[in-house]
């Protein structure tokens, strides 16, 4: 028998969330971001649910190869590009597209100029200051690619730093202006908008949008919930109570007795801890569902177990179902209580946790 903790993946939710992307950007092609094992949801499971997207974006070359070998014919984009010249033969063989964001990649492309045919996304650093050519470097990089016979098609791209922050619209306007100036009057396909920009900045939709977190049912916006956006959770992490303890006043529970009972109370011990991907730093008070009713985490999260307050759920006992996040318990709410983001919780699901659909 396996432990009762599992991640239930809902392909229908992925499909519905993709439909919301299209509703917001009806004239753009969709590059579904499925990096980090599709944000913890499973690469091929997510790809099947998102098969209507015109493209997939990820980081790992081996994952891109798996997609092609599974029969997906869409554009498949490597978001960090290639790291070694030997990877270019794989990129060509599997008809992958690659981001180019620094001069060393240009040099490697130059070395195979007579031996390859590649589609390239040229990245501008418009203010994120992470990857990409500066506005000064960008025109020369573009001309370099245009002169290289190995390069078949060029798409221009950038990435927004503050699209999720409603009081930082000036930052987005500045990045958009920077991109438009660097691109000039050249007609080439363009890709700018991540999830937050898809929802907030239609002027940035361009030819390709790149939704990530919104596909998985988490909100990219700090002050708007996934439910308000119509997004549905694609992952529900559930478990069961495996033991019940009755605490007397001032009894502690778990390591360090970080929580002590103020009065007599029942505590449920749940199969699930930080080795499964639940955040160790989640404090007492972090919300959880037991038998579909809200209660709270108490005490310190341990490697394999956590503790829930059963004071108001008198009929709960060993075997009672627990929802750690997902349907009925938004991952963003749990993340906020733990001082992190829904992105991190979804991506942190441990390999030992069973995923089911």
Swiss-Prot record:
<dbReference type="GO" id="GO:0005829">
    <property type="term" value="C:cytosol"/>
</dbReference>
<dbReference type="InterPro" id="IPR009006">
    <property type="entry name" value="Ala_racemase/Decarboxylase_C"/>
</dbReference>
<comment type="pathway">
    <text>Amino-acid biosynthesis; D-alanine biosynthesis; D-alanine from L-alanine: step 1/1.</text>
</comment>
<comment type="function">
    <text>Catalyzes the interconversion of L-alanine and D-alanine. May also act on other amino acids.</text>
</comment>
<dbReference type="InterPro" id="IPR011079">
    <property type="entry name" value="Ala_racemase_C"/>
</dbReference>
<protein>
    <recommendedName>
        <fullName>Alanine racemase</fullName>
        <ecNumber>5.1.1.1</ecNumber>
    </recommendedName>
</protein>
<feature type="active site" description="Proton acceptor; specific for L-alanine">
    <location>
        <position position="255"/>
    </location>
</feature>
<dbReference type="InterPro" id="IPR020622">
    <property type="entry name" value="Ala_racemase_pyridoxalP-BS"/>
</dbReference>
<dbReference type="Pfam" id="PF00842">
    <property type="entry name" value="Ala_racemase_C"/>
</dbReference>
<dbReference type="InterPro" id="IPR001608">
    <property type="entry name" value="Ala_racemase_N"/>
</dbReference>
<dbReference type="GO" id="GO:0030632">
    <property type="term" value="P:D-alanine biosynthetic process"/>
</dbReference>
<keyword id="KW-0663">Pyridoxal phosphate</keyword>
<keyword id="KW-0413">Isomerase</keyword>
<feature type="modified residue" description="N6-(pyridoxal phosphate)lysine">
    <location>
        <position position="35"/>
    </location>
</feature>
<feature type="binding site">
    <location>
        <position position="130"/>
    </location>
    <ligand>
        <name>substrate</name>
    </ligand>
</feature>
<dbReference type="InterPro" id="IPR000821">
    <property type="entry name" value="Ala_racemase"/>
</dbReference>
<dbReference type="GO" id="GO:0030170">
    <property type="term" value="F:pyridoxal phosphate binding"/>
</dbReference>
<dbReference type="InterPro" id="IPR029066">
    <property type="entry name" value="PLP-binding_barrel"/>
</dbReference>
<feature type="active site" description="Proton acceptor; specific for D-alanine">
    <location>
        <position position="35"/>
    </location>
</feature>
<feature type="binding site">
    <location>
        <position position="303"/>
    </location>
    <ligand>
        <name>substrate</name>
    </ligand>
</feature>
<dbReference type="Pfam" id="PF01168">
    <property type="entry name" value="Ala_racemase_N"/>
</dbReference>
<dbReference type="GO" id="GO:0008784">
    <property type="term" value="F:alanine racemase activity"/>
</dbReference>
<comment type="similarity">
    <text>Belongs to the alanine racemase family.</text>
</comment>
